Amino acid sequence: MVMQSARRRRLLVALVAFVVSAGATIMAADSSPTTPSDVPESAPLVAVSNAPQQGTEKLHIGVAYGDTLTWKSDLGLASGLDDAVALGAKWVRVDLSWRDIQPDNPKNFNWPRFDRVVKAAHERGLAVLPTIGFTPAWAQRSGCARDDSSCAPADVDKFAAFAKDAAKRYAPLGIHTWEIWNEPNIPFWAPKPDPAAYTELLKATSKAIRGADPQAYLLMGGLAAVGTDPAKGYVSHTEFLTEVAKLGGNRLVDAVAYHPYTYPYLPSAKTDFGTAFEDISSAKDNLMAVLEKYGTPGMPIWLTETGAATNGPGQASDGKTIPPNTTHVTEGFQAEIATDTVPAAAANPHVAAVFWFEDQDSGTDKDKGQRSKFYGLRRYDGTPKPAFAALRTSIAAYARQQQH
């Protein structure tokens, strides 16, 4: 998540029995290896195709959950997905962590937890967008912290092999759309962003997934909307896309995923400096211009995260004023942003999908130093913020428009 120039660092934490927030990254291996062609270990899954098709409504609308669904109790998983249904969303974006599936070595697979998420989503008619990434310690590049799943893989072919296994497993269940990595232009590609290395990963992974699933629809990993800042390890979204496109990476995917957090401005705001939403196609330096320059004009943009935090270490903006050291917004202004997000996305012909991050806060006031815990439509205790009803109303209004 981004508030113009600031950026949260979401780190996965240790496994606990049941968690509401982002959960563990390491789980015990199955007693026997599981191959992608095996029958799922969990209960039978129902196929719900999620490949974008002609004739569907213009804008795909979803909720982004990160890795939280994977580690929820059965009740928590059901509740989280029921929220997506209640909102009127048709998609859920969920982390598919390589570290969780193959924590110890490349031979053993731990699929049941993700199977469980897929099954629960499909029972509700929700399409699943997996974000594939998160390197296990045994596979990460040397010189990167062993407890950091954001580390780049030492061997992109090993990552591609995992992606192929995942595609073989889930394509028969209707999952065809994949986001390859998360925010590779900031230190979620650790130890620092590397467009050339990411392009090599794209080459290997796109070939592997498409070989396993001819219907695959691939998204370049969601670019964080940031300015270039070497001290923070940030490469701007447009600069990173440019460097990847110079190497042909844009031709390996079907769409570009992007995370345009605009707060403390509305997504529809018109400015002279260019908000993250304006950077899609109307700002002087924009994503569509890069794609056109490098041979993929009109490539769709998927907004796989957007939203606003309602707590943080600094001041809150109510949308009318922007105090010094603004780090988040009031719940009232979050609701205004939720109201504005879908129509702002729908108004841009280049945008094919928008996902709100996220369903529920993972922290209380004592955690306000970690803004990343407060993007939810619900508070930590489960009570809805005004943004929940606002987003539901906005999605319903969009659906009515599509019927006429």
Which residue stretches match the model-derived regions?
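Substrate-binding cleft and catalytic face of glycoside hydrolase catalytic domains
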Residues: 87-233, 251, 263, 297
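Aromatic-rich peripheral "rim/lid" segments of glycoside hydrolase catalytic domains that contact
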Residues: 2-6, 46-47, 139, 313, ...
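Short, acidic/polar
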Residues: 70-85, 159-167, 234-246, 335-344
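Noncatalytic carbohydrate-binding groove/subsite architecture in carbohydrate-active enzymes
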Residues: 54, 156, 160, 195-331
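Extracellular serine-dependent O-acyl
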Residues: 176-181, 218, 256, 299-306, ...
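Secretory targeting and sorting signals
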Residues: 5-31
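Structural recognition of alpha->loop->beta junctions
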Residues: 88, 164, 168-176, 240-255, ...
